[in-house]
Amino acid sequence: VPLTFAGTVDRTALHRAALALAPLVGAPEVAAAWDRESALPGMTVGGVARHLVGQFEAAVEFLGILPPPSHAPVVTLVELYRRTDWFTAPVDAPENTSIRDDFDAMAAGGQADSVAVLARSTAWLPDAVAAAGPTTYVPWQDCSVSTDDFLVVRAMEVLVHADDLAASVQLPLPDLDDELTHPALALLAVLSARQHGTPTALRALARAERATGPAAAFGPVAG
């Protein structure tokens, strides 16, 4: 059975995450480090912050594409990532560096712009979720997924990039609801298995003494 969260998601969890992350995005430590390199090599702290708030911005935008285009197939989460060019590309490949460079450029508006994007998206998100249909169109991959699966993808991205931002300025990751983190972690486990194979992912998660190397869902894939 393909991984899906359809019918199981707390659809208010993403909104609560937006509220919980506002202090981090607006933190003076983030402002002071805005143009410095982040915990992600080659990407500025500002770029990471802009990428983080962009997850909420994209949620509002994509949930509002109603109805989804008729030509777009409805796919599973695994198929969504199979269609994603950056997923298996090396971190220094254009598929990944273009994302880094785009968000570094978008961060030129400074911290105040990212704070405003987050505030605006936070205000609009509840209505966007309430009005969403059963599936949501993802223009980047020209396909649709169940709306609950779409929200889990955004939750996972939020969790990962919130940690990136916090680590970049030596702040703790803000507490986020289990309703957001548990589905996000489940998705990351499956994506790790897709990247590295089930045995590698399994051992990294369950048996450190048999772990054969890194099993991150994103990043370099062992040769």
Feature map (PLM): residue ranges:
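N-terminal interaction modules that seed assembly of large macromolecular complexes
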Residues: A39-L52
